[in-house]
Structure formats: structure tokens, C-alpha cells
């Protein structure tokens, strides 16, 4: 995922926190805010120092970024997302992180449904 698609500035984080909607599961909290003129979604990541050491926190962030990269075609491009990792995320592998993110994005109804062509 390109760096221009990441949320880095505190003002941008605060805007999404204040105006956006949130939804959560045990591992992640996701805030989302609709941006009308955006051509691509942006994501911001937050992993507290209470969660593991730096290696563990960076691994979680890599897993989240890669999950969003793989789900890119299903994610609404007009939104900004902030993902906050909770403690249970520290013990998860990539596939568990991706599955948990899919679940929380479906809860928030921001994930497009795949067309069902199994007939």
C-alpha cells in the first residue's frame, strides 16, 4: 500500500474520530469517515504500547496493511479508515488478522459483498 494512502497527521486522526462512525470486535476497533471526492481509501493504524514490544506492534501493522491491500477491491474507496488494534491481536497470525478485519468491516457494512457466481 502506498504511503499516500495512509493517515499520518494527528488532525486527520481527530477528524475521523470526531465525525466518523465506529464499530468493533474483540481484536479491532474501526472508525470510518466518508470523503466525497476521494478516489482511494486511506487508512491510519494505531497499536498501543500496551500490546507487546515494537516487533509485535510492527507485525500487527504489517498484517493490517497487507489485509487491506488484499481486500482493496471490496473496500469502499470513498472512506477513510482508522484501525485500532486491541490486545488479542498480538497473538494472531496473518490469516486470523485478515479474517477478523473482514468480520469487523462486514459489521460496519463498509465491505462490498462478493458476487455469488456459484450456481
Swiss-Prot record:
InterPro entries xref list: Ribosomal_Su5_D2-typ_SF (IPR020568), Ribsml_uS5_D2-typ_fold_subgr (IPR014721), RNase_P (IPR000100), RNase_P_CS (IPR020539)
Protein family according to the UniProt entry: Belongs to the RnpA family.
One Gene Ontology MF term: 3'-tRNA processing endoribonuclease activity
Catalyzed chemical reaction(s): Endonucleolytic cleavage of RNA, removing 5'-extranucleotides from tRNA precursor
Function: RNaseP catalyzes the removal of the 5'-leader sequence from pre-tRNA to produce the mature 5'-terminus. It can also cleave other RNA substrates such as 4.5S RNA. The protein component plays an auxiliary but essential role in vivo by binding to the 5'-leader sequence and broadening the substrate specificity of the ribozyme.
Annotated EC: 3.1.26.5
Protein name as it appears in the record: Ribonuclease P protein component
NCBIfam families per record: rnpA
EC top class, as a word: hydrolase
GO cellular component: ribonuclease P complex
Keyword line: Endonuclease, Hydrolase, Nuclease, RNA-binding, tRNA processing
Domain of life the protein comes from: Bacteria
Any one of the GO BP annotations: tRNA 5'-leader removal
Subunit structure, interactors included: Consists of a catalytic RNA component (M1 or rnpB) and a protein subunit.
Amino acid at each position: 500500500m502506498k504511503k499516500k494512502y495512509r493517515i499520518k497527521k494527528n488532525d486527520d486522526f481527530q477528524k475521523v474520530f470526531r465525525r466518523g462512525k465506529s464499530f468493533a470486535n474483540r481484536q479491532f476497533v474501526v472508525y470510518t469517515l466518508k470523503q466525497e471526492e476521494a478516489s482511494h481509501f486511506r487508512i491510519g493504524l494505531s497499536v498501543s504500547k500496551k500490546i507487546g514490544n515494537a516487533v509485535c506492534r510492527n507485525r500487527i501493522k504489517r498484517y493490517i496493511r497487507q489485509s487491506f491491500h488484499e481486500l482493496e477491491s471490496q473496500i469502499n474507496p470513498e472512506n477513510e479508515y482508522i484501525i485500532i488494534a486491541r490486545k488479542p491481536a498480538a497473538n494472531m497470525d496473518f490469516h486470523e488478522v485478515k479474517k477478523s478485519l473482514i468480520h469487523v468491516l462486514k459489521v460496519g457494512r463498509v465491505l462490498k459483498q462478493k458476487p455469488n457466481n456459484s450456481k
